[in-house]
């Protein structure tokens, strides 16, 4: 976490610089010197407020997660509470819209996933994000499916989101948001058909 006193204007500037440098040279080569140069600040500012590269990466991921949470929450607030399929689509859309689909954001996500396997604090952030996604999905899915079915489908959708993200990040053309939504909605439609047939 950044220390208190960091000017608010500097935080987004440094977060954007971090993602830009990771996009350009990768996580391991993204040095404090390169990031500070990109942001137009001294290395001392980064070291003072963030304690170095690790702290800056953590703050960058927190910002990406905040943006994701805000996008999904805003979309859900615009929909009726009983519009469950639309709300599921809103949760899916939030993971592939605008900011989240930018190349530099997706590459930072990929670096974060890799880093979090060996870092307790980043792993905790990843777990919080994962649990939030599953929780959002289960609230809606349990209104359509039996609890055990909803649990399986929620994890299926989450796995598709992660897998499409990974493939899109590794693709030079980036993430195809329309195709991502089509794939996941096709899966959801098939689950609806499958479990409806079982009830008949």
Curated annotation (Swiss-Prot):
InterPro entries: BetI_C, DNA-bd_HTH_TetR-type_CS, Homeodomain-like_sf, HTH-type_TetR-like_transc_reg, HTH_TetR, Tet_transcr_reg_TetR-rel_C_sf, Tscrpt_rep_BetI. GO terms for biological process: glycine betaine biosynthetic process from choline; negative regulation of DNA-templated transcription. Pfam families: TetR_C_6, TetR_N. GO terms for molecular function: DNA-binding transcription factor activity; transcription cis-regulatory region binding. Residues 31-50 bind DNA. Keywords: DNA-binding, Repressor, Transcription, Transcription regulation. Pathway: Amine and polyamine biosynthesis; betaine biosynthesis via choline pathway [regulation]. The keyword Nucleotide-binding does not apply. Repressor involved in the biosynthesis of the osmoprotectant glycine betaine. It represses transcription of the choline transporter BetT and the genes of BetAB involved in the synthesis of glycine betaine. This is HTH-type transcriptional regulator BetI. The lineage of its organism: Bacteria, Pseudomonadati, Pseudomonadota, Gammaproteobacteria, Vibrionales. The gene is betI.
